[in-house]
Each structure stands twice: as structure tokens, then as C-alpha cells.
């Protein structure tokens, strides 16, 4: 068995580096498979009285602002301390919020700091069609020019399954995720929209919006750009309601939370650099199950299977999220964070070295969650969806019950037992500017320990500081003369057999 440090608690963005004399508490747990247990998370209220939040994002302009999209057709700005009274944008009568319709997403140009451009995704109040429109900021940085340009409309026959996500990929193209058209079983198979490549419903679209003199152009690398009878905007297909998808800001991988029918919710995956063209299966498959809405599957169709599924036992609808790449919760690094709308549970999915995915509950809430958001630093936010003043935005934080600045995972617990995989030990790492780093940790008599260090948390980069450390039943202090000063370090202690 091994005791593995989960990470370094921090009170600011970025990884903790000891540039002055100080103490860091590092959580440690016992694990038979050497994998980190999920951190204990909590939610910190950052903005309230926000009715029916549908999306949370940032502009990438260094301002630190969050832009909160409301279903009724408004975009609000949270400036770090308060929600500004004046709307950033108000679509007015262009859209009407209700059910699954309304203003659903906002995406800012990668060059927003200089060009001031952003795009919105909404359902048109006149006929329910899906609309993507381009807007720009006014001379006031906190107010948009109300005059926009619709770049794409998609007829949508039913009020649900509108999709709703807009996001720029690492390639600079704008991705959009319209749903399959609504009702159940893809309009009961009358048009089989998600598998019909002549339609844009039930797809992931990829658009080049860099030329503002036109609406959009087709990226030449789109998979169906040369196929007759196929809409060239299509990047992937076979999706039911890809309500939320996101790109991993570190790897560029794409993760799609696709809302299921009556049995299975799923997360679909696409590696960075993929040529596109994936068929994610709907309505031939739901999750891993073939034939939910059809009489079996067609043998000559290749379906890309989801990486994760969960059933409807107490749950109903996935709200896709992000892979965590912030600095405030190191043990959450690389974890795909998502939720279920009905249960209010927030989950974390991790990928093993072998490539398989597994999921665990990170925290449970008492409210409906429709969306996650990522700020410019990679910290994650989640909404409380409500049609009254209870609507709010929260930031995911490392739980700190007593408010002393140290997460609960780093606090010494009564009856701490290094042999109990549910127990935590207290570790103190001290990094003065003119001496060796030292690490202090609790021990048990007649047990042997090994102290290890890494500077980057890469699994293969752990080095042994000291081996065969004999436990005494009291805390031991071990020096690490090989650790550079003025540098961040991560430590773990292994309980040897």
C-alpha cells in the first residue's frame, strides 16, 4: 500500500511555490492502487439572484470578469465582487425563455481583447428555430452593441433538444451543438435527424467565423466538405442533445455531455487533432445499448462508443462540464467535472494510464444544475438553476469547514490511522529560502515509510528522497537537500509493506 499526497492547498491561483519561509499542509491518504482519492469539494457562492442561468464563461481579455447567460435573453457581468446592474446584452423579443428554449450560450472570440467579437446561441421566439448570431462590444467595455448579425439559423420542429453550446476550439474554429429536433426517439424516427447528414440537427458543427465580412465559411479540413448531399458544416453526428461540451485547455481533447432518452446519460470523447466525422450513435444507440429506439443496430455503421455512461436511477439528465485545469485544487487536476440536473450530484471522471475512465461523486447539492463555467484561470463554476431569485452561481472550492485556509483533506482527524484508507495524515512541508526543504509527517511504530518528491505531478517523475524511514509513533521530520529553493514541490509518503 502507499500513502499518496493529493496536492497542495492554495489560497490563490497557480501552483504553490515556496518563495519565502512558510508552511504548506498537504493531504495524504492510503491507496492500494496508488491513485489519488477525489478531493472533498464545496461550493462558494459568488453571485445570486440570477434567474435561470444557462451558461457561464469568460472573455479571455484578462479582466477577470465572468459573463453569465440568462435564459430570458440577457447576459450579465460579474466583475469579481458584484453583478453589474446594466446588462451586457439583452436580446429583448428575439428570444423567449421557457422550457428548454431561450438564450443558451455565449462564446467570445479568441481575439476578443482586440476585436471585441462574441457569438450567442438562442432559440428564435417567432418560430423556435435555432439561431447563432455575432455581436460586438460597444465603446463601453461592460455593454455590447445591441445590433447583431445572425450567421446561421436551423429550423427546429419541437421545443426541446435544442442543444445550446457554443465554444471555440483550440484550432480557432467555432463549434456548435444543435440537438436532434426534439420529442422522443429523434422525432420517433420520422426523419432520423441525428443520422441524416443532409440536416444540421443532432450534430456537432465546425465553422470558420474569422471573416466578419460574411457569416461564416467552411473549414477546409471539415470531414464532409467534399461529400455530395452532406452539410459541410458537420464535424460529428449521432448526438441526441449535446447540451454542454468543452475542450480540455491543456490537451485540446473534446468532451461532450449528451443527454439521453429514458435510460442512459453519456460522455463522448474526441482526441485533439482528430479529423472529425465520428458517429456517436444516436438514435441507433443510447449509451452502450443498441436498439433503444430501433429494432437493433445496422451492422455496417461504425459507432464511436462513449467513454462514460450512467443510468437513470435517481438521475435524469447530464450537464456536461470541464476537465479541471485550475490551480486552486491540485488533486482535481485533469478530472472531468460534470453533474446530473435532477440529482444535483457533481461527479469527477478520471482516465487511467491504460486509457479507461472511471467516475466518482465529488459533492452533492440540493439544487438543479444546468451548466458549468470556466474562468480565465481554469477555475470552475456551477449554477443553481431556478426561475426565481434563488438562482445563483457558485465556485468549486476545496472544502474548508473551519475556515482556517486549509482544506479539510489537509486537516488532522481524530483517530487518524495510517492503516485506514479513509484516514488522513498531516504533512507539513517547510521551504525556507536559505536551507533545505523539510517534510514532517505522522508515523506509526514499527512501520516503514518512503518520502518521494516531484515537481510536476507526472506519474513517472517521482524520485525517492529517503527510503526505509522507521516510524516511531510520533511525527518525523525529514530533510530534502536535493530540492531546489524558490521552486514548487509536491511530496508523497509511501507506507512500505
Name each model-derived stretch.
Residues 36-185, 244-247, 252-264, 289, ...:
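Acidic, Gly/Ser/Thr-rich repeat motifs that build Ca2+-stabilized beta-propeller blades
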Residues 398-497:
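Short, composition-biased motifs enriched in small/polar/acidic residues
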Residues 3, 21-33:
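Bacterial N-terminal signal peptides
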Residues 86-99, 147-162, 200, 211-235, ...:
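Surface-exposed loop and turn segments in beta-propeller and other repeat-based domains
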Residues 63, 274, 333, 377, ...:
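Calcium-binding loop positions in Ca2+-binding modules
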Residues 356-376:
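Conserved blade-ending motifs and adjacent loop-strand segments that build the rim/top face
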